[in-house]
Each structure stands twice: as C-alpha cells, then as structure tokens.
Amino acid sequence: MGIEQKAGDMGIVTASLEQVVNWSRSNAMWPLLFGLACCAIEMMGAQGANYDLSRFGMEINRASPRQADLMIVAGRVSRKMAPVVRRLYDQMADPKWVIAMGDCAACGGVFNNYAIVQGVDEIVPVDVYVAGCPPRPEALIDGIIHLHEKVRRMRLDGTLREPVHLS
C-alpha cells in the first residue's frame, strides 16, 4: 500500500522534487520583452485585460535581464542589434528560455537582405517559435502554453526527459 492510499482525502500532495521545481518554473516565468517591430504591438495586446498574461505568472515585465528567465523576441533583428540580443541573453540567469514571436524573428520574414538576421536562432537558442505576421495574442499565449509543457518535462539539469509532441 503506497502513501497515496494511506493519505486518503487528507489533502496531501505527493510529487518528486523535479516535478515541484518544474511546476514552479513554468507558472512563474518572468519575461524580458524585446519588441523590435510590429509584433511588439500584438505582444502588448496580449498583456491587456482581454488576454491577461498574469494568469500565467507573467504580469510583471522585467527591465533587467538578471531578473528574467524568458526572452520574447518579437520582430526583425538587425545585424547591429544582434550583439545586444546576445549580451542580454548571456546576462539572464539559468535556466532561461526564448520565444521567437513572428515570422521576422523566426526566419527574417519579408526582409531577406544583408541587414536583417534571418532568424534569431542564429544568435540565441530558441525554444518556441510563434508563427504569424504579426501573430495574434492568442498565438503568443499558445506558444507560452507549449513552453510551459516543455519546462514541465525537463530534468533539473536542463535536459528533456522526453520529447514534447505538440498538436
């Protein structure tokens, strides 16, 4: 007979340390917003009352990368801005995650020229891509939910226990 049966309806929760840490990490992400173009307007809309990102523990945007664990890159990244994005990413504490919001952040979008980075994954590792030009706030929220699922499947050393299959 396991502890689950012995505890009955006492309100006791049994979980591993890894599950508790991942639950707290996924429910209290503090974003560092990097709005570079029109996607930033939709990102701001996602924080309004209609969509309310605070229900995901993201009600406060961090101005300092040392206080953030999630970077949302929204829009095109120029070659001159690339070192700044990398420096801010390096200043974030581990564990840290990145969402590339919009087609420009994911692959350069319509700006296929020498001055624009053809995807922010050339600069920093990206965990979730949110497609659209610009993506709606619902798409950003869907990307955040997918990131939460990924974080909940991580080991304490930062590797995935199992692959994440998104529908």
Curated annotation (Swiss-Prot):
Family classification: Belongs to the complex I 20 kDa subunit family.
One Pfam family from the record: Oxidored_q6
Keywords for this protein: 4Fe-4S, Cell membrane, Iron, Iron-sulfur, Membrane, Metal-binding, NAD, Quinone, Translocase, Transport, Ubiquinone
Cofactor note: Binds 1 [4Fe-4S] cluster.
Organism: Roseiflexus castenholzii (strain DSM 13941 / HLO8)
CC cofactor: [4Fe-4S] cluster
Descriptive protein name: NADH-quinone oxidoreductase subunit B 1
Keyword Cell membrane: yes
Membrane topology recorded in Swiss-Prot or TrEMBL: Peripheral membrane protein
Residues at which [4Fe-4S] cluster binds: C38, C39, C104, C133
Gene for this chain: nuoB1
Domain of life: Bacteria
Subunit structure: NDH-1 is composed of 14 different subunits. Subunits NuoB, C, D, E, F, and G constitute the peripheral sector of the complex.
